[in-house]
From Swiss-Prot:
The keyword Transit peptide does not apply. The modification Phosphoserine is found at residues 12, 73, 181. RNA-binding factor that recruits target transcripts to cytoplasmic protein-RNA complexes (mRNPs). This transcript 'caging' into mRNPs allows mRNA transport and transient storage. It also modulates the rate and location at which target transcripts encounter the translational apparatus and shields them from endonuclease attacks or microRNA-mediated degradation. Preferentially binds to N6-methyladenosine (m6A)-containing mRNAs and increases their stability. Residues 160-190 are annotated as: Disordered. Expressed in fetal development and neonatal life, but is undetectable in adult tissues (at protein level). Expressed in embryonic neurons, including in hippocampal (at protein level) and cortical neurons. Also expressed in transformed tissue cultured cell lines derived form adult tissues (at protein level). This is Insulin-like growth factor 2 mRNA-binding protein 1. The keyword Transmembrane does not apply. Residues 195-260, 276-343, 405-470, 487-553 form the KH domain. It comes from Rattus norvegicus. One of its GO terms (cellular component) is perinuclear region of cytoplasm.
Length: 577
């Protein structure tokens, strides 16, 4: 996606004219400008420069009296299902964007692109060409909160590599697995290790002191702490605070944090600009609930142990472009640094648990993008990459069959039903389309029921998307407190004959399941099987814990089914002999 199309050019424009205008705006390019009649092409060194050129020039810069129009150059054969939407209002909520995109078809993927502009950019994949064509026609120029959206095709790599016999993900032309695709059983797994950075928010007036003359101070911090430090000076121009990302070991991050905090305190004292400079840590919203703990216990313990005062920014401050919460720590420098260590320890634990849950999902849900689910906006540095392979994943041929339909019952607060349904049923319809699942809300069991049952029917990917959105909606609409994690009760039905396998000898399997997933798993005793000879398994926990437990139980059921089929096959062979 580094090749650019430059349109709306005068016939007299030459390569030298374009070279000059690119140089004036300090936009890097590679190779020569290929100028045609009224348009031109050029390559950029990487995707970052391509996006910067689009943001800098398109519709903003004139050349010989005509405004340049720049977008990604996409060959016709690659104009399929992928588009890029630019100039999205930064304060827009994911739900509003999803609602808009869903009007034109089924969104398979929605990833946010990192840019230096104040507005947001997303790459969207629809399920077919016609939906994509409609989205471009309707959305290009569409006014959204006083911002005119700009939409263009981007290359569809799957089309470029050929249809692959209708396979999804799959193998390249030389038979090698592409990234994110399932691999043959027994193939060595290479899990890319990604460390979560420490993200600090510092007052803009202290950024210069942190960097130092000609970068000397920040180089010294980097050298002493063996870390990589990014100061995001260009983002949010004019903002009172700037973000700093520290990439290192936990110890290196903490050492860098202490040095930065000491510099800010000294600068505040020397300039007499502030009596107190609190430590501000940025953490992705998905980790904050576990940092706070049940009834705020985890956070209170950190405060008591470190003798600090800790506050967390409101959920209302979250936007499409800002999925992070601000954790403000007040106290002595040493105490603030101790608090940072405890806070980041909790955040890293939550991150590692989520990575484990996603790795478990990956062979069942190939290619699933969490930004599309609305759980991890893709711009977040906390988002782990999709694993390139999973140990013990089934051979690719097993995915040629249609995924098995699953039925799950999720219990939500009764007062939340209206929020899930939406005005005139719009939200539940959009959710159903988005997840490609059947979603129905059962009538209350009694007039004063405090919970309602949501019945979701669909394959594993649909379950993941639909349940994820329901958890997110309940938190977003404040049905759970700001210091409370969303934990729901979920029921799945299993054959009565397989219930013993879920429990295990002396409860061993169910205990292991609870330890592994952090969910509460209960198989009620003395159940009467229903008309399909099935019994209920109850799962209680936060989203990832619940998902992990569901998948592990489905794995157990699949093994039972496989053994049963194998036994029947052996009996049939014995009879034939």
């Amino acid at each position: 996606m580094n090749k650019l199309y430059i349109g709306n050019l005068n016939e007299s424009v030459t390569p030298a004219d374009l070279e000059k205008v690119f140089a004036e705006h300090k936009i890097s390019y590679s190779g020569q400008f290929l100028v045609k009649s009224g348009y031109a092409f050029v390559d950029c060194p990487d995707e970052h420069w391509a996006m910067k050129a689009i943001e800098t020039f398109s519709g903003k810069v004139e050349l010989q009296g005509k405004r340049l129009e720049i977008e990604h150059s996409v060959p016709k054969k690659q104009r399929s299902r992928k588009i890029q939407i630019r100039n999205i209002p930064p304060q827009l909520r994911w739900e509003v964007l999803d609602s808009l995109l869903a009007q034109y078809g089924t969104v398979e993927n929605c990833e946010q692109v990192n840019t230096e502009s104040e507005t947001a950019v997303v790459n969207v994949t629809y399920s077919n060409r016609e939906q994509t064509r409609q989205a471009i026609m309707k959305l290009n120029g569409h006014q959204l909160e006083n911002h005119a959206l700009k939409v263009s095709y981007i290359p569809d790599e799957q089309i470029a590599q050929g249809p692959e016999n209708g396979r999804r993900g799959g193998f390249g032309s030389r038979g090698q697995p592409r990234q994110g695709s399932p691999v043959a059983a027994g193939a060595p797994a290479k899990q890319q290790q990604v460390d979560i950075p420490l993200r600090l928010l510092v007052p803009t007036q202290y950024v210069g002191a942190i960097i130092g003359k000609e970068g000397a101070t920040i180089r010294n911090i980097t050298k002493q702490t063996q870390s990589k430090i990014d100061v995001h000076r260009k983002e949010n121009a004019g903002a009172a605070e700037k973000a700093i990302s520290v990439h290192s070991t936990p110890e290196g991050c903490s050492s860098a944090c202490k040095m930065i905090l000491e510099i800010m305190h000294k600068e505040a004292k020397d300039t007499k600009t502030a009596d107190e400079v609190p430590l501000k840590i940025l953490a992705h919203n998905n980790f904050v609930g576990r940092l706070i703990g049940k009834e705020g216990r985890n956070l209170k313990k950190v405060e008591q142990d470190t003798e600090t005062k800790i506050t967390i920014s409101s959920l209302q401050d979250l936007t499409l472009y800002n999925p992070e919460r601000t954790i403000t720590v007040k106290g002595a420098i040493e105490n603030c640094c101790r608090a940072e260590q405890e806070i980041m320890k909790k955040v890293r634990e939550a991150y590692e648990n989520d990575v484990a849950a996603m790795s478990l999902q990956s062979h069942l849900i190939p290619g699933l993008n969490l930004a599309a689910v609305g759980l991890f906006p893709a711009s977040s540095s906390a988002v782990p990459p999709p694993p390139s392979s999973v140990t013990g994943a089934a051979p690719y041929g097993s995915f040629m069959q249609a995924p098995e339909q699953e039925m799950v019952q999720v219990f939500i607060p009764a007062q939340a039903v209206g929020a899930i349904i939406g005005k005139k049923g719009q939200h539940i319809k959009q959710l159903s389309r988005f997840a490609s699942a059947s979603i129905k809300i059962a009538p209350p069991e009694t007039p004063d029921s405090k919970v309602r049952m949501v019945v979701i029917t669909g394959p594993p990917e649909a379950q993941f998307k639909a349940q994820g959105r329901i958890y997110g909606k309940l938190k977003e609409e404040n049905f759970f407190g700001p210091k409370e994690e969303v934990k729901l009760e979920t029921h799945i039905r299993v054959p009565a004959s397989a219930a013993g396998r879920v429990i295990g000898k002396g409860g061993k399997t169910v205990n292991e399941l609870q330890n592994l997933t952090a969910a509460e798993v209960v198989v009620p005793r003395d159940q009467t099987p229903d008309e399909n000879d099935q019994v209920i398994v109850k799962i209680i926990g936060h989203f990832y814990a619940s998902q992990m437990a569901q998948r592990k139980i489905r794995d157990i059921l699949a093994q039972v089914k496989q053994q049963h089929q194998k036994g029947q096959s052996n009996q049939a062979q014995a009879r034939r002999k």
